[in-house]
């Protein structure tokens, strides 16, 4: 082992001594310094060997290396913005009002034109639904009849409770929508029903009186035969005493017993008739009371039905009136009419179809941008946005700045972009400046491109990211 180490030591020591000796005579080994014209007269191979190399290529190489070093330093230090690009358009803020009908209707009259300023509550357009006027007229007629029927049964109920003639007064304004014919008909019905009820009561009252008279007559006979029976019984007792004393014949005793039995039988017959009449009187009295009860119950039931019918008809009339009012479309706010889509009288508009948009006086433009799925993870509310309007080249007219105001939590499907997220961007100004200094107002629906600043990165990382991605992906291959 020592021999091997000493051999290595001798080897390096030898070359060290050689290098030291050569270094001592290094100047003697150089070619003599010759002038340019002296070198030109030397043989070609000596001229090539002894002519010094030009310093320009070396200087250029140094400059290139210096430039590369500066470029690497700047690329490592300098930062560039990370931008997410999203297409979109200019829209008004949520204060703009879309005017839509509530049902399929026909345009009756148009009172405004595109670009016109309207006040709140001003009539914009008059629509009419098929059959709406007929429905209202029919409901009013039915409601007036229902009110008359209610009055009819209410009047009858009052007459029943007070047991007096019904007081009929149909001159009230409540019945102004009903015809004279209907009012007369109701009046006659009230009188007829009340008269019929009174006739039924009168008939039963007369029947009761007849039965009561019969009762009085039978009661008299009962009292008569009660007295006759007592007398005949007393006489029978006396006849039996006389018969026992042999002062009276048996034939006379039997004759008296027969008279007593006949008196008792007559008394029993009339008592039976009296009981029957009392039962009939109770029945007639109950029937008399039932006539009033049934009539009152029927009146109450009919009154309840017609009150409910009137309530339903009143709701139906309110519904039809609301339907008519809804067809008279008025401005919900003061503002400017835009995107008017109806121009033909008699044209048909469908449910929820946008007829026009009312832009309030203080409304402002906003931008809506469609952020792609690949960028949504880096976009957040409050980030700065540069908005370029495609109508006006930004190199000549400039651009608009703004900030992300809101991002929808759910994606929507777009035919060309796939699933995207809708973002609202507030803009700092509502106009651009032309090259000659004129102010150009921005308009609703203009297409824009939103460049959202999501962060910063160094130029070096930007340049090396493709290489890093390629290396990473290549290392994953089998």
From Swiss-Prot:
UniProt topological domain (Periplasmic) ranges: 99-478
Q: Which GO terms describe its biological process?
A: killing of cells of another organism; protein secretion; transmembrane transport
Instruction: Look up and give the membrane topology term.
Output: Single-pass membrane protein
- Entry keyword set: Cell inner membrane, Cell membrane, Cytolysis, Hemolysis, Membrane, Transmembrane, Transmembrane helix, Transport
Q: What's the domain of life for this entry? A: Bacteria
- Pull one GO CC term from this UniProt entry: plasma membrane
Name the family the entry cites. Belongs to the membrane fusion protein (MFP) (TC 8.A.1) family.
Q: Which PANTHER family match?
A: MEMBRANE FUSION PROTEIN (MFP) FAMILY PROTEIN, MEMBRANE FUSION SUBUNIT OF EMRAB-TOLC MULTIDRUG EFFLUX PUMP
**Official protein name in the record:** Leukotoxin secretion protein D
What is the scientific name of the source organism?
Answer: Pasteurella haemolytica-like sp. (strain 5943B)
């Amino acid at each position: 082992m020592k021999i091997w180490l000493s051999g290595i030591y001798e080897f390096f020591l030898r070359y060290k001594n050689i290098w030291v000796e050569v270094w001592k005579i290094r100047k003697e080994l150089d070619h003599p310094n010759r002038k340019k014209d002296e070198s030109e007269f030397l043989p070609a191979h000596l001229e090539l060997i002894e002519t010094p190399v030009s310093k320009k290529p070396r200087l250029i190489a140094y400059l290139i290396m210096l430039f590369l070093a500066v470029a690497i330093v700047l690329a490592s230090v300098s930062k560039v913005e990370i931008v997410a690009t999203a297409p979109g358009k200019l829209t008004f803020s949520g204060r703009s009002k879309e005017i839509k009908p509530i049902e399929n209707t026909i345009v009756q009259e148009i009172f405004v034109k595109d670009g016109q300023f309207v006040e709140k509550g001003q009539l914009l357009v008059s629509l009419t639904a098929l059959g709406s006027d007929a429905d209202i007229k029919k409901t009013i007629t039915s409601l007036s009849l229902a009110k008359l029927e209610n009055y009819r049964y209410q009047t009858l109920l009052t007459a029943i409770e007070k047991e007096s003639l019904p007081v009929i007064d149909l001159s009230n304004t409540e019945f102004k929508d009903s015809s004279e014919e209907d009012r007369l008909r109701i009046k006659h019905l009230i009188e007829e029903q009340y008269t019929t009820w009174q006739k039924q009561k009168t008939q039963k009252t007369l029947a009761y009186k007849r039965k009561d008279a019969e009762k009085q007559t039978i009661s008299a006979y009962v009292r008569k035969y009660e007295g006759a029976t007592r007398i005949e019984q007393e006489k029978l007792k006396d006849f039996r005493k006389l018969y026992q004393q042999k002062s009276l014949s048996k034939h006379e005793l039997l004759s008296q017993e027969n008279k007593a039995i006949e008196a008792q039988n007559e008394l029993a017959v009339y008592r039976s008739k009296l009981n029957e009449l009392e039962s009939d009187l109770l029945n007639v009295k109950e029937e008399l009371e039932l006539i009033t009860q049934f009539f009152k119950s029927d009146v109450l039931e009919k009154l309840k039905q017609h009150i409910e019918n009137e309530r339903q008809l009143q709701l139906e009339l309110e519904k039809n009136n609301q339907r008519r009012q809804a067809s008279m479309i008025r401005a919900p706010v003061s503002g400017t009419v835009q995107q008017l889509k109806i121009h033909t009288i008699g044209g048909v508009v469908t449910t929820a179809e946008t007829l026009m948009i009312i832009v309030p006086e203080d409304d402002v433009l906003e931008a809506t941008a469609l952020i792609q799925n690949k960028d949504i993870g880096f976009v957040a509310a409050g980030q700065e946005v540069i908005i370029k309007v495609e109508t006006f080249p930004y190199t000549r007219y400039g651009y608009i700045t703004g900030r992300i105001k809101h991002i929808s939590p759910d994606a929507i499907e777009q035919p060309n972009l796939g699933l995207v997220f809708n973002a609202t961007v507030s803009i700092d100004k509502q106009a651009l400046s032309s090259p000659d200094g004129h102010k150009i107002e921005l308009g609703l629906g203009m297409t824009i491109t939103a460049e959202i600043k999501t962060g910063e990165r160094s130029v070096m990382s930007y340049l090396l990211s493709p290489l890093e991605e390629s290396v990473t992906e290549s290392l994953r291959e089998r």
